[in-house]
Amino acid sequence: MKPTSLLLAATVLMSTPITSALAASATPPDVAKKPHVVKAPHGAERNDEYYWLRDDKRENKEMLAYLNAENAYTDAVMAPLKPLEDKLYDEVVARIKQDDASVPYRERGWWYYARFVTGKDYPVHARRKDGPGVDAVSIQAANAAGDFAGEQVLLDVNALGAGKDYYNVGDYEVSQDNRLLAYADDTNGRRQYTIRFKNLDTGELLPDTVTNAEPNLVWSDDGRTLFYVDKDPETLLSKRVKAHVLGTPASQDALVYEEEDDSFYMGIGRSRDDKFICISVESTVSSEMRCTPAASPGVFTVLAPRERDVEYQADHLGDRWVIRTNADGATNFKIVTAPTDSTSRKDWKDWVAHRDDVFVEGFELFDGFSVVAERANALESLRVIKADGSSDYVKADESAYSMGLSANPETGTDWLRYSYTSMTTPATTYEINTKTGERRQLKQQPVPGYDASKYVTERVWAPARDGKTKIPVTLVYRKDVARDGKAPMLQYAYGSYGASMDPNFSITNVSLLDRGVVYALAHIRGGQEMGRAWYDDGKLYNKINTFTDFIDVTDYLVKEGYAAKDRVAAMGGSAGGLLMGAVSNMAPEKYKVILTLVPFVDVVTTMLDPTIPLTTNEYDEWGNPEEKGYYDYILTYSPYDNLQAKAYPAMFVGTGLWDSQVQYWEPAKYVARLRDLNTGKGPVVFRTNMEAGHGGKSGRFRQYRERAEMFAFMLDQLGVASK
């Protein structure tokens, strides 16, 4: 089938991309080469002529001048595409119900929700008192009508962020007596949060502040003490749990627990029944929990001592602990139980058995039933286990989708709330009665002008080069796009840390689909879509599989006619940016343009430096290059080290000056060396957000503006431009 006239009217094929023509005549910034040798403990040495671009304080004038010059060059190259960028941005904003609100949930006698104000970037967090006739449906109706009588505003993030280039509230927590609020905010994207306090009875901000913290907060039962996670100011590792007593200086906060092993990170939370406050410490391959009674916090007692290659996460309800673990060879995890006062491994009793073909992702406990989040064949499912031991699965409506637990703070209910979405179905919140099976839709993300019937999503399986592995791929495209090998395609993947990339609806992607672009989400190894073995096959000495899987998916989709071989774009960020750098080195001819955001591209140098944030947490993900074997293996794929004098695709590289996860100098060095070696004609542009961190700019509209610029660059390179 040929594209309809509507689609053709929105598509123009150009022989030479505007950005390529302009980049050929423009001159990118000069960047000095300065000799520097990076040494490894085992004696290996590497030259890094752009190492000088690193400045931990972000103050070096020569470095800042270079980043600003790169931004100016990007502005110049992108200037002719400003009308397209504006059009893309306007299209996305038009798909937003700007005064939308979340589905309220009830907790301790109050209904909590977030709502947006038309034209504003940030949410308003609010609550309403429970009472006769007050429920999620009535509150949604009131919010939609602009009726905020009886609402108590917890945080107006627009007011808090006013005048700031960057602002983010990472977490907030209401005290058990509902009177006090603690919240954590970040003003530069570095993820070093400041904790602040508010009296909800008076609306007064209290003078107490705690700096350099994680957005992870737990109140004691008496509402006088807040437990929080303190960060190391240099490595940004979550190192200590402290207790702040209101009305006292933060310098006097008591040390509750300190983790000595830098390969672990930590968090703190309450058990499901609020009886315990628990500290969780985890590495890539091990975990340990320590808990204390919430009513009288004291010594945090270890549930089960840490063991290498044994992970567990526990929760408590009633008279037992319920524990998800991979102990005893349960590669895909199982669920066990233990008595409240006997939690060592010898006391664990199997409850949900391990299965080779089903990955147990998590669980939620209720008084009359339990829910297990599972994954099989790269699809999520929710299994409801009833008190009598029987079980049912929550039904999905499509063949490729995403399903997960939603807010369920109360245990004494028969109703389970969950979320559902797909690449064609906007985010939807349902609740299902676990006794009767009745399902109610509480909300679907409103998308003005969107017609789901015009699009199709499907799941295909691409063969990997090993001849035995099948890689799941989720596709979405307009129904009037022919599978004739002529369409442009954007292929996205991540493939690290066991993070599963599930198919979600995207209002920004609709603008691509309406221009005839096929969108492909590749569920490659290194993620956990197919279970723990899928992750293990894409890390450490198996990391190369992540990159070859991505390339093999591209080859398959082109072979099957989903895309033209010369009109393929690739996109990834962070560890997915490592993926982009690797595939551009391994198979540059297969990609017309690559979009790489906050890319982790200098793996060896970063992993050799324990002072860089996250390095020590990740030795079991990439390997420790202080060991010669890992050093040599990482060198085979590290993007910065494998750049060569050859033709590379056009590339859009983005970073944030204050990025805490991938330091800005990695993409800066990468772009400098790439430009020096690249023999291709495609432009390389480098955008640094000078006020942003790993997640980009804050605020919903500014993020859409960033995406519009990047997509305008990509569409131009693919030969697609809007009239």
From Swiss-Prot:
Optimum temperature is between 35 and 40 degrees Celsius for the hydrolysis of Gly-Arg-pNA. Stable for at least 30 minutes below 20 degrees Celsius. Disulfide bonds: none annotated. Keywords: Aminopeptidase, Hydrolase, Protease, Serine protease, Signal. Optimum pH is 9.0 for the hydrolysis of Gly-Arg-pNA. No hydrolysis of Gly-Arg-pNA is detected below pH 5.5 or above pH 11.5. Stable over a broad pH range of between 7.5 and 10.0. Its EC number is 3.4.14.-. GO terms for molecular function: aminopeptidase activity; dipeptidyl-peptidase activity; serine-type endopeptidase activity. The active site is at 574 (charge relay system), 659 (charge relay system), 694 (charge relay system). It is an enzyme of class 3 (hydrolase). Nearly completely inhibited by 0.5 mM ZnCl(2), 0.1 mM N-tosyl-L-lysyl chloromethyl ketone (TLCK) and 0.1 mM leupeptin. Strongly inhibited by 0.5 mM CoCl(2) and 0.1 mM chymostatin. Activity is hardly affected by general serine protease inhibitors phenylmethanesulfonyl fluoride (PMSF), diisopropyl fluorophosphate (DFP) and N-tosyl-L-phenyl-alanyl chloromethyl ketone (TPCK) or by aspartyl protease inhibitor pepstatin A or by CaCl(2) and EDTA. The keyword Hydrolase applies. Coiled coil: none annotated. One of its GO terms (biological process) is proteolysis involved in protein catabolic process. Residues 1-23 form the signal peptide. PANTHER family: PROLYL ENDOPEPTIDASE-LIKE, PROTEASE FAMILY S9A OLIGOPEPTIDASE. Monomer. Sequentially removes dipeptide units (NH3-P2-P1-) from the amino termini of peptides and proteins. Is able to catalyze the removal of Asp-Arg from the amino termini of angiotensins I and II. Has slight endopeptidase activity on N-terminally blocked peptide derivatives which contain arginine residues at the P1 position. Does not hydrolyze Ala-Ala-Ala and Ala-Ala-Ala-Ala substrates or insulin beta chain. Belongs to the peptidase S9A family. This is Dipeptidyl aminopeptidase BI. It comes from Pseudoxanthomonas mexicana. The lineage of its organism: Bacteria, Pseudomonadati, Pseudomonadota, Gammaproteobacteria, Lysobacterales.
